[in-house]
Amino acid sequence: MAGLPNSSNALQQWHHLFEADGAKRSPQAQQHLQQLLRTGLPTRKHENWKYTPLEGLTNSQFVSIAGEISPQQRDALALTLDSVRLVFVDGRYVPALSDATEGSGYEVSINDDRQGLPDAIQAEVFLHLTESLAQSVTHIAVKRGQRPAKPLLLMHITQGVAGEEVNTAHYRHHLDLAEGAEATVIEHFVSLNDARHFTGARFTINVAANAHLQHIKLAFENPLSHHFAHNDLLLAEDATAFSHSFLLGGAVLRHNTSTQLNGENSTLRINSLAMPVKNEVCDTRTWLEHNKGFCNSRQLHKTIVSDKGRAVFNGLINVAQHAIKTDGQMTNNNLLMGKLAEVDTKPQLEIYADDVKCSHGATVGRIDDEQIFYLRSRGINQQDAQQMIIYAFAAELTEALRDEGLKQQVLARIGQRLPGGVR
């Protein structure tokens, strides 16, 4: 595809970062680099990139910094949560800041072995970039029938640098949830400081037969950051996966969730909340393949867009030819908080089977004046009335969080991004 005017410069820099550790790179990383260079960067003329600005990123001078932080710095950014925590700083695992995993129910190994990793469901240029530049792979396994008592928390801390340079950090994780196992995994992304940086993330998850996954993503990076993520879920028969993403920070944040339902009677729930403010862009994308019959999926994606922010949603459900009795629903609800706020939404269905029940829908609206009037008549001021309505709009997603402490921390982050909140 035709690239951006400065596409070749960005590609050359990423190639240079790759070659700096070339001797350590796996053959699979080499292949992803070659695919990246062949593909090039997209432009706004490419349909899937029409609303995602890349110019502010690709004209940067990229560096890869191996920063060190103290336990106090980690704790200042951490969630208050009883968990097994693994800490990654600037793309690298830091054992000294992480919890021991022995006896936790999670088997963790960190290396550059990529031979057993699943192929990408929907590959694109930034997926290839992360696969090529990630320093290592975090291999996580939960054995058959195991149910770890605590959630696994993957904490990612990326620092920005002063001046024109942009620190780029890439994180690669893989989880194997064996037959009958149950686990909760939380991805937490934060910035060490207020300078801009570029985060790439890739997480692949195999959910075996009768296994149950709870996945939560918290993207809480700073307002100058760029964040491009690709999560793949593969479900076997009778498997269940619930994925909740709270995309609450970043100049440009693009999150892809691609899923294959590869066994009968599997159940999937994908929820997301995006809240772009000021001039931020948040682009949420889902790709779901119903490859076997008798599966059930529900998706609920909500955005609250303030100021001159832009939210993008693109979701597709594909029902294969023999996937009978499929039940798939996808909903995208959007709330505009400013006259210049924008939403672009494109839910899609591709159905190649008979005897299925599928639907999609999207709504775009503003706060109802009658609701405001009602609350004002009860003595509630304008700003508090707005915030009450917004919290109610988001509640369908936040209430899905089982841990009350975690829920309150997500609500606090939402509050920071509301009109009148501290940003």
Where do the protein language model's features map onto the residues?
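Short, low-to-moderate order helix/coil transition modules at the start of elongated helical scaffolds
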Residues: 1-202, 209-212
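Conserved beta-strand/loop scaffold segments within soluble protein domains that form the structured core
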Residues: 116-380, 394-397, 401-423
